[in-house]
Amino acid sequence: MRIILRLKLAVCCFVVLALPFRIQGQETVNPGTVLPDDSVALENQVRNSKFNTVLPQVMRDNEIDMWIHVMRPWTPDPLNFEFGSDMGIFIFTDRGEDRIERAIFAGHVSDRNAYNIISRPRVQLPTFVDGVITEQPGGDETDYLKFRFDGVREFVAERDPDRIGVNYAEALGLSAASEHAPLTDGLSHTDYTLLLNALGDKYAKRVVSAEHLILDYLAGRVPEEIELYRQFGLITADSLDREFGKVVPGVTSLSDLEGNVFRRNPDGVEFHAQDREPYILQPGDVFTILHGAGNRIFSSDLGGNAYLLREGETEAPPEIQNVWRAALETRQILLANIVAGRTAGQTLDLLIQKIEAAGYHYNPVDQYDSTADPDLTQVHLDVHAVGRSGLVAPRISPLGSDWEREMTIPVLHTFTFEYMIHMPVPAWGPGKHIYIAFHDGAVVTEDGVIIPYPPDPGIRLIR
């Protein structure tokens, strides 16, 4: 068995970024030296870079003078990593300078140098026995919760903000935005009431939802993350080569391979590695592997496709060559038309126009459309964000909620060229088609899209 990487009709160049890693007052770390260890120093560096660059931008874009984020112990919060903590009252104030003032009340942080003000950093927590509070510092639970807000009113009054963003959802449907944690609606009713009481009537009236600010902050990236994205992408590319190299036609099943492994037959029936009776790959099959690599700081993923040569074949048959051409043309359309500053929804509309102008049928569903023109190859898009938080927005896709399409694509947006090609093969019969899927990594810069690590290089030919 050998793999022939011959079907490379054209492959877009990938760009290796030369990125600075300097944070004033902090020890800097080369991400390439710490990937196996999940370096705490690198975590702190990423956190400080976001505080220095992303935080001022998103607060001013959303016209928020002060951002108060209440994080209660024992409650998952999407900003645990971003703030370096799992408890506290975090207050970020725009005082008209380049650097946003950062303060925390009644909480602890992993990197004290990241904050200007730390008030009561060590708060004694209740004692639990079998899940029941047996000893409560300061009295009953209400007293303890209220204690966390001591000093907040005076702190806020001294800064006199006009608009105070707080972590509760107001207009957006966010339940499906993250697999692991609530996104912007992490504030309990009790803490909301305690916060308003602590602020007093004057400043309580200035409170607004920080939902858009939080989403923009989670979507923001810094150069250190882009470098990790690149390095994990290279690791993923090696993993794909390894898995495709295992395939022996007629012997290897989908479940023998690592990653998200699947195949669709000419009727669109999908087979998965997790099937009770895993499919055994045969000559003439086309299949896909999606793989990934990462740590708690960042992650990357990549997809690859392969064709198993039939007996007597020495190269890909015409239909395989044609579906790869369609994939490359679609990739070039994405590269040429995704830019920062436009919303994901506006970008989706533009891509649909370009795809259809190129002679393809845009399909909003990842299933072959039997009612479409049988002479047109069908393209489906789910170009979503990739990163650490689980946030998939901004999302250039018909899938998901409207707010995911309403988000503006920021500079250094990390995302995946996830798109699918359904190419009809009339010679095989009505509705028969070939399916391939892509999951290339990409970054939006001020100058357009770059590919930080090699994309799918071509349909691998396996004999």
Task: Give the predicted meaning of each segment.
Residues K8-R22:
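Bacterial N-terminal signal peptides
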Residues Q26-R463:
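Active-site neighborhoods and metal-handling regions in enzymes and metal-associated proteins
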Residues M1-L5:
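N-terminal secretory signal peptides that target proteins for export/translocation
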